[in-house]
């Protein structure tokens, strides 16, 4: 049963908080990011615009189901041993209030292992009106920044905006952080190889509508004289 508990901790991004270290690049195989056009055959109650598949999650599509739950004596755990599609999960299981599945700024989503590229960590979704309008994918920073950037270019093409910045760690080590934005007709992707600490990076994936909301929010928070 301990291995199942470990899977749950990994899915919720909790392993890093209890002292586990990310595997070395030589210890894991790189997996390609899956960013494909969504199936154009949609149900009648879905919006007609095309969505994007990213890490097996449809950005612009309906919210995925909750991860499979296994009931145990005195509680329950998520059973991710035979996960076939992405699903959402919550850290408090059924002990606390259920998460808001209509509108949520940070709902944890668990991709299937074959859709999780090496170097990615916790994935959270922005849910608007029951649909996934955005994804926030945390990464391990400098360790796989350039590999992830290459994979994103393979799937999305040449970035709309591209650059690099030098980041210095607390002990004086210097790292190169790739930065890129893909502003495409049906998806917006912002990749930051290193954010804050050198072992932390970020990928933001938004629908055009969500990107417009984010831009408006940032503009409203901008301070001036």
Language model features by range: what are they?
Residues 1, 18, 38, 103-104:
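Intrinsic-disorder/low-complexity regions
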Residues 21-98, 129-225:
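Non-cytosolic coordination micro-motifs
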Residues 11-20:
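Hydrophobic h-region of N-terminal signal peptides that target proteins for export
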Residues 1-8:
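Bacterial N-terminal signal peptides that target proteins for export
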Residues 96-128:
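A glycine-rich, hydrophobic loop/mini-helix early in the fold
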């Amino acid at each position: 049963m301990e291995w199942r508990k470990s899977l749950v901790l990994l899915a919720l991004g909790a392993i890093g908080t209890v002292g586990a270290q990310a595997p070395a690049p030589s210890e894991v195989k790189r997996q390609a990011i899956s960013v494909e056009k969504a199936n154009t055959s949609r149900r009648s109650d879905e919006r007609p615009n095309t969505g994007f598949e990213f890490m097996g999650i449809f950005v612009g599509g309906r919210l995925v189901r909750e991860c499979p739950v296994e009931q145990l004596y005195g509680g329950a755990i998520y059973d991710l041993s035979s996960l076939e599609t992405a699903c959402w999960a919550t850290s408090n299981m059924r002990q606390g209030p259920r998460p808001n599945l209509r509108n949520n700024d940070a709902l944890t989503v668990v991709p299937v292992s074959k859709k999780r590229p090496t170097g990615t960590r916790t994935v959270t979704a922005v849910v608007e009106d029951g649909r996934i309008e955005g994804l926030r994918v945390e990464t391990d920073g400098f360790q796989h920044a350039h590999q992830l950037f290459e994979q994103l270019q393979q799937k999305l093409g040449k970035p709309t905006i591209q650059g690099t910045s030098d980041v210095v760690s607390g002990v004086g080590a210097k790292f190169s952080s790739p930065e890129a934005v893909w502003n495409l007709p049906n998806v917006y992707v912002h990749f930051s190889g290193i954010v804050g600490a050198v072992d932390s990076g970020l990928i933001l994936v938004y629908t055009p509508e969500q990107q417009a909301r984010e831009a408006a929010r940032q503009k409203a928070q901008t301070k001036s004289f």
